[in-house]
């Protein structure tokens, strides 16, 4: 009972302890949740405050647009960078991701380098100003919203602007997917970018002549300067999502500002000056303490995060690198349908007159050695500034390594500057430690930037640069063949740019293509983009497969030699390991002047074109050899059988009859060969002594009498009389001896067990007797007896010491 009560009490105490522990853990968890909510609430309040302040500032800034336009352009050009600097300083960095925080050393280095560059020569544009790729974060209020109407640049009444202001506060979130940032309602182009927690950036190209001309135009009082400074925030809009390849270059460069050709009602909206990039470069210089460090960290993250070969890159060059979205549809109207058509996969070409480039101007300046990127000079025609800036910014965002082609101007009369080829970015070798970063960027571009109608493959060399007046650096890469991507002539591979006396620049590219899967003989890339060629020229696509007779693995690279010139001749030589013959296939695409304006060209890139005749001959040869081999195989078994029979005959003649147990031929009178069962062949004969031993072994192993009398092979009874050996008697004796052994073993076991019991019983009795004695002694003699015994022992010790002293 006592034990049960104790166990019950212990159980209850354990349960209570567990409940207490659970309650304690729950209380701690609740306290932790409350602390997190307490921390979250102030952050949300701060964020709401910042958003409210930004919204109020944006509204005040856009509401004061009419008054600011009446003021001088010099004041606007000065106040706009100052306001952007103030807002960027006012904006806190709490919303930045933790991965963008760089070390103090990197910050110090970046700020010192920028300041030194500014102190060297203030009159000359520094390399930081000349660098076209400026990484901007989406945390500046002046880069947040952008509302543009073509009517805002025309002298209209203030009522129209007030009507636009009423439409302004409606927030339009940035869509993802095919429909892009721009949503137009009538004559209004209103884009709204929410502030995401993820990392956003945009590569903004800035051109040297624009940067140099900015102060001059501001002094002259050009009324377009403030408008450009107000329009440049939309340049830096980016999409939501963190490093997503699908939104890499969805919207690059200036906003989709519709350029109308006809219609008296609709005023054409265009950038009337090229120096709106200069204000952006000035802002980047003044905010170098804040943006340069982020630029370095974001470039590192950009190189590390981007996957080289991602299948989801098929949407990254939506607007095209070297040509603009308005190359397909230049005369689109200012409504949502055409604007979305440009934003989505492809837009229907208009039937108006297409303004193809006559503005392929040679560059006025070459980039310096320390300069990372430079852009071609702006176009003299102001109406083409939108297309130019769009193409340049797209190229800068698409790839740090692009191609800067400077060719002769076209001679068409009614064409407008589209800057399809000249508005690209050239890259030179950076000295010293910057080469490694260039290699990384090259390798990155090899997986991103593409001539999108060719088949994907990895580059041979990460970098190639040829610097001359007609030999700019050209980087090529073959990307996956897709039908919804414009032609991007900036590719990464080993390329050599050559030019002849007539000005036809050609590019010779050695590019590997990996045959990942069996491709169709003719893979066409439809609706890519217009090629800047004359209407009378033709496209010739030549494909020759040159292989060797040696077999190669399936993943062998296909080296493609691409010869490309601006006159429209395209020759493709593709060597693969599919067939051992040479084959030339030519496809000519004749393009007239009217078709050139409205119909996109279809390019054929043939990378795998097997020769069926050669395959058939090879199959026939292989079938012939297979027949020969099968005939040989049929003849071989007959020879083997003959050899085996001859060997068996020789063995039987030499050795004679063998005992199946000891494998010894012949017998003796004392040990003859017997036939105990119905076995034949090599198992027919057994020696007498061998059979006796075998039967004894079977009996002693514990087999039954029936198993002993039966042959293991033929399952027949052994009909032998071994004379002195009686199998039944031996079996009975073995059984008796076995029983006796078992009995003896059991008796011995019992004796040993009884002995152990006796020892255990004696030990228990002794322990019990000792316990009884102790209890009896404890009852007779109480506890203090032990203390008295100790005292008496001490007294005896003292008496002994005294007696010893007396004896001495």
Swiss-Prot record:
One of its GO terms (biological process) is protein ubiquitination. It catalyses: S-ubiquitinyl-[E2 ubiquitin-conjugating enzyme]-L-cysteine + [acceptor protein]-L-lysine = [E2 ubiquitin-conjugating enzyme]-L-cysteine + N(6)-ubiquitinyl-[acceptor protein]-L-lysine. It is an enzyme of class 2 (transferase). SMART domains: RINGv. Residues 237-249 have a biased composition (Polar residues). Gene3D superfamilies: Zinc/RING finger domain, C3HC4 (zinc finger) (3.30.40.10). Keywords: Metal-binding, Transferase, Ubl conjugation pathway, Zinc, Zinc-finger. InterPro entries: MARCH10_RING_CH-C4HC3, RING-CH-type_E3_ubiq-ligase, Znf_RING-CH, Znf_RING/FYVE/PHD. PROSITE patterns: ZF_RING_CH. A zinc finger (RING-CH-type) spans 651-721. Residues 33-81, 101-268, 284-415, 773-808 are annotated as: Disordered. Zn(2+) 1 binds at residues 659, 662, 687, 690. Residues 34-49, 330-349, 379-397 have a biased composition (Basic and acidic residues). E3 ubiquitin-protein ligase. E3 ubiquitin ligases accept ubiquitin from an E2 ubiquitin-conjugating enzyme in the form of a thioester and then directly transfer the ubiquitin to targeted substrates. This is Probable E3 ubiquitin-protein ligase MARCHF10.
């Amino acid at each position: 009972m006592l034990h049960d009560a104790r166990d019950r009490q212990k159980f209850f105490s354990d349960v209570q302890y567990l409940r207490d522990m659970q309650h304690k853990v729950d209380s701690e968890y609740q306290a932790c949740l409350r602390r997190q909510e307490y921390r979250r609430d102030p952050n949300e309040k701060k964020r709401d405050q910042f958003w409210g302040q930004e919204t109020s500032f944006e509204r005040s800034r856009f509401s004061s647009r009419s008054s600011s336009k009446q003021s001088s352009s010099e004041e606007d050009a000065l106040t706009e960078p100052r306001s952007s600097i103030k807002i960027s300083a006012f904006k806190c960095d709490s919303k930045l991701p933790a991965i963008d925080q760089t070390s103090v050393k990197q910050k110090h280095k970046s700020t010192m380098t920028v300041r030194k560059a500014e102190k060297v020569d203030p009159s000359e544009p520094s390399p930081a100003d000349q660098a076209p790729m400026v990484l901007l974060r989406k945390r500046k209020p002046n880069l947040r919203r952008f509302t543009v109407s073509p009517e805002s640049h025309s002298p209209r009444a203030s009522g129209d602007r007030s009507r636009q202001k009423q439409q302004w506060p409606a927030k339009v979130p940035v869509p993802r997917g095919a429909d892009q940032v721009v949503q137009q309602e009538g004559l209004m182009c209103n884009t709204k970018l929410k502030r995401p927690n993820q990392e956003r950036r945009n590569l903004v190209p800035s051109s040297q002549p624009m940067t140099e001309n900015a102060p001059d135009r501001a002094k002259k009082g050009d009324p377009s300067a403030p408008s450009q400074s107000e329009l440049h925030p939309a340049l830096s809009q980016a999409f939501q999502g963190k490093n997503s390849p699908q939104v890499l270059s969805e919207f690059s460069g200036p906003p989709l500002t519709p350029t109308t050709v006809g219609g008296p009602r609709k005023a054409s909206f265009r950038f009337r000056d090229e120096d709106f990039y200069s204000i952006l470069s000035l802002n980047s210089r003044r905010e170098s303490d804040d943006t340069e460090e982020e630029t370095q960290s974001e470039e590192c993250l950009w190189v590390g995060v981007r996957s080289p070969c991602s299948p989801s890159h098929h949407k990254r060059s939506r607007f095209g690198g070297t040509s603009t979205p308005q190359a397909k549809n230049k005369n689109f109207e200012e409504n949502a349908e055409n604007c979305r058509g440009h934003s989505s996969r492809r837009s229907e070409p208009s039937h108006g007159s297409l303004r193809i480039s006559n503005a392929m101007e040679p560059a006025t300046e070459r980039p310096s050695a320390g300069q990372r990127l430079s852009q071609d000079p702006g176009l003299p025609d102001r109406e083409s500034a939108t297309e130019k800036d769009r193409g340049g910014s797209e190229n800068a965002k698409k790839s740090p390594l692009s191609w800067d082609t400077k060719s002769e101007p076209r001679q068409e009369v009614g064409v407008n500057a589209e800057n399809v080829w000249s508005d690209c970015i050239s890259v030179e070798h950076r000295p010293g430690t910057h080469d490694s970063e260039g290699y990384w960027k090259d390798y990155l571009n090899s997986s991103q930037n593409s001539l999108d109608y060719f088949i994907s493959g990895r580059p041979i060399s990460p970098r190639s640069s040829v610097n001359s007046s007609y030999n700019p650096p050209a980087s090529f890469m073959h990307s996956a063949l897709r039908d919804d991507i414009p032609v991007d002539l900036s590719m990464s591979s080993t390329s050599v740019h050559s030019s002849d006396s007539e000005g036809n620049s050609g590019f010779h590219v050695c590019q590997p293509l990996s045959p990942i899967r069996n491709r169709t003989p003719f893979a066409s890339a439809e609706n890519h983009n217009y090629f800047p060629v004359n209407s009378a020229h033709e496209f010739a696509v030549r494909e020759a497969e040159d292989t060797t007779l040696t077999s190669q693995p399936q993943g062998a690279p296909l080296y493609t030699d691409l010869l490309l010139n601006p006159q429209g001749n395209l020759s493709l030589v593709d060597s693969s390991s599919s067939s051992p013959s040479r084959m030339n296939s030519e496809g000519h695409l004749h393009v007239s002047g009217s078709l050139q304006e409205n119909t996109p060209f279809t390019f054929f890139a043939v990378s795998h074109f097997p020769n069926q005749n050669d395959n058939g001959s090879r199959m026939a040869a292989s079938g012939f050899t297979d027949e020969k081999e099968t005939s040989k195989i049929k003849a071989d078994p007959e020879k083997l059988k003959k050899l085996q029979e001859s060997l068996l005959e020789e063995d039987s003649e030499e050795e004679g009859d063998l005992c199946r147990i000891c494998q010894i031929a012949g017998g003796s009178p004392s040990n003859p060969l017997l036939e105990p069962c119905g076995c034949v062949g090599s198992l027919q004969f057994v020696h007498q002594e061998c059979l006796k031993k075998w039967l004894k072994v079977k009996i002693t192993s514990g087999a039954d009498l029936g198993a002993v009398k039966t042959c293991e092979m033929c399952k027949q009874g052994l009909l032998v009389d071994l004379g002195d050996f009686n199998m039944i008697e031996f079996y009975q004796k073995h059984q008796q001896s076995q029983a006796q052994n078992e009995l003896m073993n059991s008796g011995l076991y019992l004796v040993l067990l009884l002995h152990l019991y006796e020892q255990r019983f004696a030990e228990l009795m002794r322990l019990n007797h000792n316990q009884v004695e102790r209890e009896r002694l404890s009852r007779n003699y109480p506890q203090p007896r032990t203390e008295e015994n100790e005292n008496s022992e001490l007294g005896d010790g003292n008496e002994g010491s005294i007696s010893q002293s007396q004896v001495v």
